């Protein structure tokens, strides 16, 4: 981090902006719009405040309703179990063929009735909007937002389609048998081929022409607080068949159903819900959405379009959070940071910065070692004094100006990850190192003198009075630098790649700036590195 601080600071300093001798300038590349903070910072938290009057009401109602409803739910489950046995007896746990027609005709009507009876006994008042599509019209239902275990009511209303569920759930006594009666697609956490097998199974059933039951999928993959729609996983959209979006709403004054990573437990929510006079839920079946030819070839595009339609109907925003953000939240809590510190919008960060979960998790460890002692789990310039980043200095302030994307005086984990990837990302292949060496070797004698190094670096950064002698002395073993010395230093310290290749990378402003805000890059001193070489070195870059 210290070397990154030096590298970032060198790239950020220009004269005359009022910070020390050299001052501060805005980052060389303007902020990328797609990296702006999400409209909903944390969709995985729920804080329900219950007034004293409401508590008293719940206690009085609960004295009667809680035991009665618990008894009724238990009774319904016991009544449903024999039908589940008839539906699954002598059938393998992982079905290769659909349940026979005679089993369906005996069990399905009874299970549908008992499913509705169970939610009625729990106090749910269900409103259904729209028309349920037939298996031929839409083999797959996609349900959102997914916010609670009570969302199973969508399965009952849709006519008991198959679910995608963990293999362990099918092993649970009583409930496991009921789940198997729905002919679920089971996912194994220990099988390395589980994801591929699950997708193939969904594809096979979706394209069976109605032979299998419809499949109901919660594409978000985890529960949220219904304040937004997070990233849809592409599994339900890979078959390229029409899907029917299903919206869930819980329009109650007191929210007793939301089950998130930070909030009430399963038992607490059951007790709170059972103590309500009734709980309203709306299930809306939207028009069937058929994929275009382009969307058949790109399930992520199909998922994105369907998500946007559902968000528009719900009048809520979309974010790029996903289940991996939940894993990072848990990791942050284990590192004594606030759980929300781990939220980064994993889908967006991993896609745009080419980072996988392990890489971001490693950055979280680094971040925690700096921020664990800071208030609120955020890095501040003053709180970092004497720590790993170093004392508060002009260099540190310059680094903060680059990392602090929202200019609030502190760096959260999301800003930290983006800053490291953008500013300190190693970019030193041997070809780039060779071009960089030629850039500095003005007289083409195979060595870089201090004068050559300073002249080109100052010109390429647009900072004519920048002092880079210290950096030169760190590279050089004498009065000049050979190619082998230059290469050795660049490979050992990849964080300086941004400095060595600034001349070749000025076009990155097109990648990280808003289209209307793209500014003309400062002119730089030319040497014998030809324009053709420059184009070759940059033509592979992809503009966002």
From Swiss-Prot:
GO annotation terms (biological process): membrane organization; phosphatidylcholine acyl-chain remodeling; platelet activating factor biosynthetic process
GO molecular function, one term: plasmalogen synthase activity
Positions annotated to bind Ca(2+) 2: 441, 443, 445, 447, 452
Nuclease listed as a keyword: no
Gene3D superfamilies, alphabetized: EF-hand
Domain EF-hand: 391-426, 428-463
Cellular component terms per the entry's GO annotation: endoplasmic reticulum; endoplasmic reticulum membrane; Golgi membrane; Golgi stack; lipid droplet; membrane; plasma membrane
Name by which UniProt lists this protein: Lysophosphatidylcholine acyltransferase 2
Naturally occurring in which organism (per UniProt): Rattus norvegicus
